From Swiss-Prot:
Residue stretches making up the Radical SAM core domain: 44-262
Function: Catalyzes the conversion of dethiobiotin (DTB) to biotin by the insertion of a sulfur atom into dethiobiotin via a radical-based mechanism.
EC class name: transferase
Protein name, as recorded: Biotin synthase
Binding sites annotated in the UniProt record for [2Fe-2S] cluster: C103, C134, C194, R266
Organism: Ectopseudomonas mendocina (strain ymp) (Pseudomonas mendocina)
Entries under InterPro entries matching the protein: Aldolase_TIM, BATS_dom, Biotin_synth/BioAB, Biotin_synthase, Elp3/MiaA/NifB-like_rSAM, rSAM
Cofactor: how bound: Binds 1 [4Fe-4S] cluster. The cluster is coordinated with 3 cysteines and an exchangeable S-adenosyl-L-methionine.
Top-level taxon: Bacteria
Catalytic activity: (4R,5S)-dethiobiotin + (sulfur carrier)-SH + 2 reduced [2Fe-2S]-[ferredoxin] + 2 S-adenosyl-L-methionine = (sulfur carrier)-H + biotin + 2 5'-deoxyadenosine + 2 L-methionine + 2 oxidized [2Fe-2S]-[ferredoxin]
Quaternary structure, from the entry: Homodimer.
Keywords: 2Fe-2S, 4Fe-4S, Biotin biosynthesis, Iron, Iron-sulfur, Metal-binding, S-adenosyl-L-methionine, Transferase
Cofactor(s) of this protein: [4Fe-4S] cluster; [2Fe-2S] cluster
Length: 352
């Protein structure tokens, strides 16, 4: 495939084709990925999101990589659902440091009926602040998905994690088909999809290819594809797993960019472990989204000022979205906070 040829969006990738991409010489692969990237995106713009854990710990799932699983002793304190106003305050702070999307994550197998009203209020409030909204709450029913869409949720994150073949080695409490069903519900409800996976769990190159095939062969590509590098947490079964080779990680980003040319490819968890040179290679490979702030749910993330310093050195600017004038935006913040303060949901969220 010529690096400069026009790229058509495909949904029929085969393992042999994706293997061939992975097996290219490193420079050829990066050149092809960067060429594809430039056909659809400004190469010097990166979308910036902030992630907040709105409910931490004691998750009933047994994901072997996750410090929030109740199956493992990782020293993580269990926390109740965060109050709506605190979520809105965190969103306003994220906005102030340059984030355009606010992502809220809860350590649940699925949201309960009693939690949904608070979650919906969070979505509505963050939207009023002028931010895009994203949530990751676990498995959803069709009714819950529709309610989130009606509240104004822009993105729903539900990662596939790895290939179907390797998946059973990592998670036994939820099936791969259940994950795909949730993604189908999200798409049917008219929301955008954020879905990717994790590298460094002991998977093979074919498993990495298999993950990308599952994502790229969906009826519509995910708008956002987070590629995570395993953050090894003491107490989890993967705490002693071998490190991912940095070049293998960059290769996966590049292949994701080629296969899903119009998606934002997010350099996600594990960035704290990457030096500036590796992050620069990631942007060259087509990564054009990051999480911004000091924490990703429960693990460290590069500090915001370090990110902006690196952006400046590389000539990168945060991706912009249409904004209200400052005074209109400030009024929206104040109004949203007042509405949440006056709501019964505001008072009861923490004890629900």
């Amino acid at each position: 495939m010529s690096a400069t040829a026009a790229i058509t969006t495909r949904h029929d990738w085969t393992l042999a084709e994706v293997r061939a991409l992975f097996e290219q010489p490193f420079n050829d692969l990066l050149f092809q990925a960067q060429s594809v990237h430039r056909q659809h995106f400004d190469p010097n713009r990166v979308q910036v999101s902030t992630l907040l854990s709105i409910k931490t710990g004691a998750c009933p799932e047994d994901c072997k990589y996750c410090p929030q699983s109740g199956h493992y002793n990782t020293g993580l304190d269990k926390e109740k659902l965060m109050e709506v106003e605190k979520v809105l305050q965190a969103a306003a702070e994220a906005k102030a440091i340059g984030s355009t999307r606010f992502c809220m994550g809860a350590a649940w197998k699925h949201p309960s009926a009693k939690d949904m009203p608070y979650v919906l209020k969070m979505v509505e409030g963050v939207k009023k602040l002028g931010l895009e909204t994203c949530m990751t709450l676990g498995k959803l029913t069709q009714e819950q998905t529709q309610a989130l869409a009606e509240a104004g949720l822009d993105y729903y994150n539900h990662n596939l994690d790895t290939s179907p073949e390797f998946y059973g080695n990592i998670i036994t409490t939820r099936t791969y088909s259940e994950r795909l069903q949730t993604l189908a519900y999200v798409r049917e409800a008219g929301m955008k999809i954020c879905s990717g996976g994790i590298l460094g769990m002991g998977e093979s190159v074919d498993d990495r290819a298999g993950l990308l095939i599952q994502l790229a062969n969906l009826p519509e590509h995910p708008e956002s594809v987070p590629i995570n590098m395993l953050v090894k947490v003491k107490g989890t079964p993967l705490a002693e797993e071998k490190d991912v080779d940095p070049f293998d990680f960059i290769r996966t980003l590049a292949v994701a960019r080629i296969m899903m040319p119009k998606s934002h490819v997010r350099l996600s968890a594990g960035r704290e472990q990457m030096n500036e040179q590796m992050q620069a290679l990631a942007f060259m490979a087509g990564a054009n989204s990051i999480f911004y702030g000091e924490k990703l749910l429960t693990t460290a993330n590069p500090q915001a000022d370090k990110d902006m310093a690196l952006f400046k050195r590389l000539g990168i600017k945060p991706e912009e979205r249409e904004e209200h004038a400052d005074e209109v935006h400030q009024a929206a913040i104040e109004q949203a906070l007042v509405e949440q303060r006056d709501s019964k949901l505001f008072y009861n969220a923490a004890s629900a």
